[in-house]
């Protein structure tokens, strides 16, 4: 695959592999050996861009916690110099509720945990997972700038950012990429494109297949166990 460039200089494959579903949100965690093989196959196919997050956890049948970052870090360790690993901070899942904390203290604690679980000395792209209404974007951006100076991250991004939030953060520390929902079923963030072009910020789409709706796996005759499915 021919590389794309996010921001000023972050080269990635045009299609990235989102790893969330391996441990989180779609039932029990998948078999880790099978997922390791899948990740190795993805590298062999030309994928260089892999996405995870500190909050992508699940519960194994034995009751232990499956950490997505641990799975990704272990599987990609032999290819570390060939791949770009993106992870995220600032969100915790508390049952059906999200707790958002993007204070400098929380970000610093999170980055140390992610570095350890990923078995790496730096994170290529570190996202603020969600906007924290209690922390100004300038504060988050300044924290990210410090982490860059310390060599713990090399680029940073924001997930679910608005134009105003992006501009304020970018003025303090240039943002490499925005990761927002985008698909043929959800196109609200297309309004951001002119701003991204102006600021030279990349756009990374999540849920491009609308959580599977556009994957051709479902028909008008498909039936589910309950309405929540």
Description of each model-found segment:
Residues 1-83:
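N-terminal binding-site loop/beta-alpha segment at the start of enzyme catalytic domains
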Residues 10-15, 46-48, 79-83, 120-124, ...:
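Short, well-ordered coil/turn segments that N-cap beta-strands
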Residues 17, 35, 50, 72, ...:
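Conserved, mostly hydrophobic/aromatic
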Residues 55-56, 78-102:
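Structural motif corresponding to the early beta-alpha repeats
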Residues 106-127, 150:
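CE4/NodB-like, metal-dependent polysaccharide N-deacetylase domain
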Residues 131-229:
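Beta/alpha (TIM)-barrel catalytic core signal, keyed to glycine-rich beta->alpha loops juxtaposed to Asp/Glu
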């Amino acid at each position: 695959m021919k590389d794309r460039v996010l921001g000023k200089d972050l080269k990635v494959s045009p299609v990235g592999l989102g790893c969330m579903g391996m441990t989180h949100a779609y039932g029990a965690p998948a078999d880790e050996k099978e997922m390791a093989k899948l990740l190795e196959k993805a590298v062999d196919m030309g994928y260089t861009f892999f996405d995870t997050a500190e909050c992508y956890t699940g519960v194994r049948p034995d009751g232990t916690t499956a950490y997505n970052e641990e799975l990704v870090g272990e599987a990609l360790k032999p290819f570390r110099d060939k791949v770009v690993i993106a992870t995220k901070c600032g969100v915790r899942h508390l049952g059906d509720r999200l707790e958002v904390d993007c204070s400098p203290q929380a970000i610093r604690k999170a980055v140390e945990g992610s570095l350890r679980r990923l078995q790496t000395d730096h994170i290529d792209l570190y996202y603020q997972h969600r906007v924290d209404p209690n922390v100004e974007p300038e504060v988050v951006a300044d924290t990210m700038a410090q982490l860059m100076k310390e060599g713990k991250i090399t680029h940073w991004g924001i997930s679910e950012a608005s134009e105003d939030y992006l501009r304020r953060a970018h003025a303090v520390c240039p943002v490499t990429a925005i990761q927002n929902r985008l698909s043929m079923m959800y196109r609200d963030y297309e309004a951001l494109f002119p701003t991204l072009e102006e600021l030279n910020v990349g756009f990374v789409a999540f849920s491009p297949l609308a959580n599977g709706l556009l994957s051709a796996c479902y028909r008008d005759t498909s039936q589910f166990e309950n309405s929540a499915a």
